[in-house]
Amino acid sequence: MKQYLELVNEILKDGEKREDRTNTGTISKFGVQKRYDLREGFPLLTTKKVFYKAIFHEMLWFIKGDTNIKYLVENNVKIWNEWPYENFKKSSEFNNETLQEFVERLKNDNEFCNKWGDLGPVYGKQWRDFGGIDQFAKLINDIKKNPFSRRHIVSAWNPAEVDNMLLPPCHSFWQVYVSKDGWLDLQLYQRSGDVFLGVPFNIASYALLMELIAKECNLKARYFVHTIGDAHIYLNHLEQINEQLKRKPLPLCKIKINSEKSIFDIAFEDIEIEGYESHAKITGEVAV
């Protein structure tokens, strides 16, 4: 995906070095935008291998309105583990358990998981219950009834509850646009984007969301417009980022939704990726 590599080069060229909340340090650029045409293929990064199963599970978890990571850890999705673990470490119950021991206890102890596996009122809660409003169901209904409305909006940023979230929403606000000839576009505003670890996930995640909404509403997915406020590369990811820049993007894969079920009932097994080829995996530490 050349757009992603263009974003990386823009940040390295024009960004500024900044201190950050995690004390890792970043190179940051404010206000960037990239456009991905889903008609050309599913925008799953090819310059490093991406664990797309985690992306699919997470999106279904959002749609269900879930905020406890039990479903994720049971499906070997590790992307949220560090935040509840760091929260647990601050408690009087912490007894020097490792992260892996913490995760295993979440899997096997429901009472412990109910207490320590919840992230607070994060994405799923806001999508499905923003002050009593099911934004997601309303969006689907409104697209079907009034497709050309300019009010097809879902917000995960709730100022009344943001301080109760273990991590305030990075991808915080999105809007859907329906063209007169049956195409569905989506623009995401992301307040903060970890370009090495997070942004490749976010691109594929919202592309999947587009495909799911389009199928539900009898439309076709077209443009994903990704707007990022603080787009940053952590300083401890520079070696990995430069390795990616040496790699040539490969052809994009395809995605299929093999079900006629409602978007609210779609399961992981209903989603299929065809022809995904990538360069080797590149790892990096998450900044918490």
UniProtKB/Swiss-Prot annotation:
Active site at C170 (nucleophile)
Q: From the UniProt record, list the reaction(s) this protein catalyses.
A: dUMP + (6R)-5,10-methylene-5,6,7,8-tetrahydrofolate = 7,8-dihydrofolate + dTMP
This entry carries the following GO cellular component terms, namely: cytosol
Disulfide topology: none
Question: What EC number(s) does the entry state?
Answer: 2.1.1.45
Entries under Pfam families matching the protein: Thymidylat_synt
Q: Which UniProt keywords apply?
A: Cytoplasm, Methyltransferase, Nucleotide biosynthesis, Transferase
| Single GO molecular function | thymidylate synthase activity
Which Gene3D superfamilies has this protein been placed in? Thymidylate synthase/dCMP hydroxymethylase domain
SUPFAM superfamilies in alphabetical order: Thymidylate synthase/dCMP hydroxymethylase
User: Where do the annotations place dUMP binding?
Assistant: R21, R150, R151, R191, S192, G193, D194, N202, H232, I233, Y234
Q: In which pathway does it act?
A: Pyrimidine metabolism; dTTP biosynthesis
Binding locations of (6R)-5,10-methylene-5,6,7,8-tetrahydrofolate = D194, A287
InterPro entries documented for this protein: Thymidate_synth/dCMP_Mease, Thymidate_synth/dCMP_Mease_dom, Thymidate_synth/dCMP_Mease_sf, Thymidylate_synthase
The GO annotation for biological process reads:
dTMP biosynthetic process; dTTP biosynthetic process; methylation
Q: How does it assemble?
A: Homodimer.
Q: What is this protein called?
A: Thymidylate synthase
